[in-house]
Amino acid sequence: MPETIIYISFFTSKSPYEKVMNTYLRPSLERWNLIHDIQAIKDLGNWQKNTSYKAQFVLDMLLKHKKTVVFIDADATIEKHPSLFWEIPEEYDIAVHYQDWYKQWRNDNCGKRFDLLSGTIMFRYNEKTLSLVRKWVERTKTFTIWEQKVLQKITEENKDIKIFKLPVEYCTVNNHKGEIPNYIKPEEVYIRHHQASRKFRNRRNWK
């Protein structure tokens, strides 16, 4: 039988993100009959703190389910059945996409910068991964930088973590026009991130 994989996500309660979840990710998970665990969390006060909670949430879900989990942001849609997650060899601890920043935002193929994106990320349930995520939790409590930058730094420090690099089609981020970047074929996209945070990061837009 195929491995059981739990798809996880959260949203801030009493905020526009509840509607975002119910418009984007939740219907996608149901469409593809993917086992999922979605939780509402209390507002921690600002966008930085709410997004940094991702690390604690992933740890809680790993300990709760004791199975491989795939975290996907609330404003993502699953365009095609994400079969790759079942095909990744067991030896890999996490699976994540590294965005070619210059290609995404400057249409430049210089390949000078690659950023870990935590919008779509798979975690195996094992001791190495649990240790990594616990470090992620602790660092996000003291660092003021974006949680995915914290995770990138930790993975670079922990060479024993085996990382599977997801293709861009599993973490396709809309450009500033709200469109799929022209270097990606729309029909090949599996998971698309619609970037609702661009609007709702500013709380004046919550009304």
Where are these regions (language model features)?
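GT-A fold catalytic core of metal-dependent nucleotide-sugar glycosyltransferases
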Residues: 52-106, 110-115, 120-127
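ER/Golgi luminal nucleotide-sugar-dependent glycosyltransferases, focusing on the catalytic module
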Residues: 47, 97, 111-116, 188-196
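Catalytic core and acceptor-binding pocket of nucleotide-sugar-dependent glycosyltransferases
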Residues: 123-207
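Conserved beta-strand scaffold positions in the cores of enzyme catalytic domains, especially
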Residues: 36-39, 69, 94, 163-165, ...
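Short, solvent-exposed polar/charged micro-motifs at secondary-structure junctions
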Residues: 47-50, 105-109, 172-181
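Short, solvent-exposed loop/turn segments at secondary-structure junctions
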Residues: 12-13, 43-44, 76-77, 100-103, ...
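N-terminal anchoring/stem segment of glycosyltransferases
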Residues: 1-68, 127, 158-159, 194-200, ...
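Short amphipathic alpha-helical segments and helix-helix/interface helices
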Residues: 26, 58-59, 82-86, 148-155, ...
